[in-house]
Amino acid sequence: MAQPAELSREENVYMAKLAEQAERYEEMVEFMEKVAKTVDSEELTVEERNLLSVAYKNVIGARRASWRIISSIEQKEESRGNEDRVTLIKDYRGKIEVELTKICDGILKLLDSHLVPSSTAPESKVFYLKMKGDYYRYLAEFKSGTERKDAAENTMVAYKAAQEIALAELPPTHPIRLGLALNFSVFYYEILNSPDRACDLAKQAFDEAISELDSLSEESYKDSTLIMQLLRDNLTLWTSDISEDAAEEMKDAPKGESGDGQ
């Protein structure tokens, strides 16, 4: 039987869209990886870049949601002292973690070998470096010990490199710059346990975007305002958490002393 001919770049993009419509995201990833690997030193188009991002986001998102649910059940069973069940849950969680690691390793390898080196426009550089930070952050969510430390350090390096370009080259209202600020602040809050830094970063990004709202382009208005809303929601949540923590520290601390700042 004759081997099917290799699909062209356009055909792979079409097949990725088809897979997206059918919600077959693993196959969508495969089609977009082929596109990324066939362009060599050429940049992906904005459409191709977004398709790749959507494919991976769905594939990783399903596993991250599974991991959170299983971890929550594990905590409940631990608190009840059900050791036998905890052992079963840990094994099952490990299976999900293997899948998460494989997905993250796949996109990180593609970013390092093709996507970051071939990017020339500031927008695409920030997009891919942010993506690199995101997938190292996803690793840091479930890894422990040295692996977690390494993942967190790699997240920081990628986000900082993206931030440097974004602040210099992209307007404060640009959805990619705002998305970077959103994810970087989440990293500070969730992975580094630095709520003050998380709030500072989110507030600065939000305030700068608000001050330049008039310059927001028609095509990015919806994306930008949505991310700004998410930044504001996080700020509301985080500042209330900080206030509660501070109140607890004041209650517990000896008179004349305050709790340590982050």
Swiss-Prot record:
Belongs to the 14-3-3 family. Induction: In response to penetration attempts of powdery mildew fungi. Pfam families: 14-3-3. This is 14-3-3-like protein B.
